[in-house]
Amino acid sequence: MSDSHSHSDILLCQRCNKNHASVISRKEKFCTDCFRNFVSLKQRKQMMSDQYYQDIFKVMYKDKLRSEQDAHLQNLNSKILVPLSFGSSSLVMLDILNDTLLEQSITHRGKTGFTVDVIICFHDEQIQNQIKENVSKLINAKYKENNQKIKFHLVDINQFFDNSPHLQSLVLQETDFLIKSLNLKDQSIIEKKLTLSEILDQCSDRSTYQDLLAFVTKHAIKKYAFQHDFKAILWGHSMTRLADEVISLIVKGRGSAISSSLNTDDFDENYGNKFKNLYPLKDILLTEIDAYCYNSGLHNYLINYNIQDALLVNKINQNTDKIQTNSLKNKTINELARNYFEVIEGDYSNVISTVVRTGDKLAEPKSQENFKISKCNLCMQKIYSDPSQWITSITENKGHPLETDEEKENYQRWKNYNNDKLKNSEMDFFRLNEFVKENGSKACLCYGCTITLNTFKDKSVVWPVHDDKELNSVLEDYVLTDHEE
Amino acid sequence: MFTAPSDPVNVRKELKVTQLCELCHSRKAIIRRPKNLQKICKLCFFHVFETEIHETIVSNDLFYRGERVAVGASGGKDSTVLAYVLKLLNERHDYGIEIVLLSIDEGIVGYRDDSLATVKRNQQQYQLPLEIFSYQDLYDWTMDDIVETAGIRNSCTYCGVLRRQALDRGAAKLEIKHVVTGHNADDMAETVLMNILRGDVARLEKSTSIMTSSTGSPIKRSKPFKYCYQKEIVLYAHYKKLDYFSTECTYAPEAFRGTARELMKNFEAIRPSCIIDIIASGESFVLKQKMGKQNKKKIITYNDGNRCERCGYLSSNKICKACMLLEGLEKSRAQIKIQVQVPGEPQQEGPAKVLRTLERLTF
Ligand SMILES: [Zn+2]
Ligand SMILES: [Zn+2]
Ligand SMILES: [Zn+2]
Ligand SMILES: [Zn+2]
């Protein structure tokens, strides 16, 4: 593909017919300005997609519906939360929001319809300094003028456990795939304090690790939105990212969660119905975002992200091979789905949008007969049918009878072995698990989380009880400014 | 006192407890089930494999006593194991069904000849009646002729359309109203992914149904292997030493399906349970009701009495799918002759177009 673009000086932007084209997207040649416009318009279209969002983003004035005071208050209270991961998408989205604020400021004599709070989550101490440095660089280079309208908050997601008044132990019974849970009111059952990394270390594969981390991060963001009265969370997901999310949810047995995770119409019911979730970049491919990111100089602020130059007229010539060396076995489900879309984008360009559109057509599942819809103790997703019942209905869990003396002998040895294991172990996880199985109550886990728990070393996990207390226990944040060291 | 060393024949290596089957805890585990990662022994594997299929049959009421059931037998591993297990379960649990092996001879030289020979041996081995219908008999076309005319790219879909109706027609001729096929969990999962990737909304909700019947056909179809992993079917055939023909259909899937298949292989490599997980997802799919478009939701009721004008086969359309397809083939056979004279002219009325029309008809 690159060969045909090598004579870049011949290419003219097809929008303005003046400037040289720097990006080729959807079979059209764009100059940097026209492409920025193209992407920006698509984001703004999503931000104006219905009345609720229009009320947030538009600059309000006194009219039939509201007094001057009301209008002023509405502008002031239109707070949106923007999670920033320092990947290309969230940086680009923030850039477009900044432009929107600047434009409003100019056309409305200093007034804006909304304010932006950026939330940056981290769990690894080492990355903290780089985040601080990048934020201060960003503010100085880009957001000085909107100093009052865009604020940056740093949240340490290790608070996940410290921040939870009640912990529970969730244990999977292998025989019937039922989940037993026990509230650990008396935390002394566990000798030392639990940390997020200890829980994450129990994951047997990278996929599960990333899923748990993603949940904990999302939980922190939504909890923050709940506690600080935000009207909406603007997620930076590109169309490509949403497509890989849809596929990954299906592959993880979480297909029933697709409709709720793509839902931008309703308030988030897991967090007190206080805010909605919006995906302003859902009409834009990741390759397009990367092109925007690079052409706007935003690539200087990326952390742990490699930009794709597929649509750029002048290739960046960076060592993209590095990403590919990660072997197939080490990839997560999301990464595999992402790879698939990256490869397929050339030959079947509409597959990505098809997947997102199809995902959008899915409704909330019907609940199984005689099944009371409940919520997953782990991921808070709604459960529409009993996973353990489904699994046991398609999985036989009895064996072929014992026949020979040797077999009977082996069986006896196995029994003794297990008894010894139980006797000799201290109050560790094995003991605790047996205790929970005997004394715990039946808990609800969604199908996906049941499968996740099955891949854990001990088939168990200690997890916060997601209740009102937990939701209201204050999440500490740290405000970042432009003068970090 | 002298003790004789024990007879070396009786010395056996004592199995470590961790090597034991996780179900019976008494025999050596030799298989790790992809479904739940359980390590089990051979005898327990036979038991769970057969019992799970039995459970699927019973909980979905697939059969009724006295029903005559045709097993679509291709000689491949899926259908061979299906014939074997169905016969076994029918005897073990007394379903009271009558099983007939039904084979279609597409006329694929080299592939079909050998696989038909396998089916014929299966007939002897399992003592089940066998009926063979050929494309030549049913459509006056062989698969090799079709490929020559339609191009190899579309052959699998063609093959599917024709084979599907061929099985139905064959069953109808035998006055059998139920065809069981060896579609397994892997096929099911692939279909779910394909329907999402292609945006095939019309088929999305039904991607995972165990029982289907195509429009225009009085024959119902079921898939007792819906929850069986391909890998376990192969293992079962292997350990039971079943006689099957191991070569896959020589006509490769169309390119896009190929990409989906590879994607699924990759998923499976990092998470073996994903096949059943995808089916779990697929079973939850419900489409949003379109608002303000109620008038569009008119249900086209199928008149049972309709028959194809050409061949008399039951069909909701004036001309049945197979006849449509054959008409297209006739056209393109003529066109190929023209195209030889006018090279470079884009093919307008080709089989691909007919195929698209046909696919729309299916909904
Ligand atoms: Zn331009
Ligand atoms: Zn869950
Ligand atoms: Zn066993
Ligand atoms: Zn016909």
Swiss-Prot record, chain A:
It is found in: Cytoplasm. SUPFAM superfamilies: Adenine nucleotide alpha hydrolases-like (SSF52402). InterPro entries: CTU2, Rossmann-like_a/b/a_fold. Pathway: tRNA modification; 5-methoxycarbonylmethyl-2-thiouridine-tRNA biosynthesis. Its main location: cytoplasm. One of its GO terms (cellular component) is cytosol. It comes from the Eukaryota. This is Cytoplasmic tRNA 2-thiolation protein 2. It comes from Vanderwaltozyma polyspora (strain ATCC 22028 / DSM 70294 / BCRC 21397 / CBS 2163 / NBRC 10782 / NRRL Y-8283 / UCD 57-17) (Kluyveromyces polysporus). The gene is NCS2.
Swiss-Prot record, chain B:
It is an enzyme of class 2 (transferase). InterPro entries: CTU1-like_ATP-bd (IPR056369), CTU1_C (IPR032442), Ncs6/Tuc1/Ctu1 (IPR000541), Rossmann-like_a/b/a_fold (IPR014729), TilS/TtcA_N (IPR011063), tRNA_thiolation_TtcA_Ctu1 (IPR035107), UPF0021_CS (IPR020554). Pathway: tRNA modification; 5-methoxycarbonylmethyl-2-thiouridine-tRNA biosynthesis. GO terms for biological process: protein urmylation; tRNA thio-modification; tRNA wobble position uridine thiolation; tRNA wobble uridine modification. One of its GO terms (molecular function) is nucleotidyltransferase activity. Its main location: cytoplasm. Its EC number is 2.7.7.-. The keyword Glycosyltransferase does not apply. Keywords: Cytoplasm, RNA-binding, Transferase, tRNA processing, tRNA-binding. Plays a central role in 2-thiolation of mcm(5)S(2)U at tRNA wobble positions of tRNA(Lys), tRNA(Glu) and tRNA(Gln). Directly binds tRNAs and probably acts by catalyzing adenylation of tRNAs, an intermediate required for 2-thiolation. It is unclear whether it acts as a sulfurtransferase that transfers sulfur from thiocarboxylated URM1 onto the uridine of tRNAs at wobble position. Prior mcm(5) tRNA modification by the elongator complex is required for 2-thiolation. May also be involved in protein urmylation. Belongs to the TtcA family. CTU1/NCS6/ATPBD3 subfamily. This is Cytoplasmic tRNA 2-thiolation protein 1. The lineage of its organism: Eukaryota, Fungi, Dikarya, Ascomycota, Saccharomycotina. The gene is NCS6.
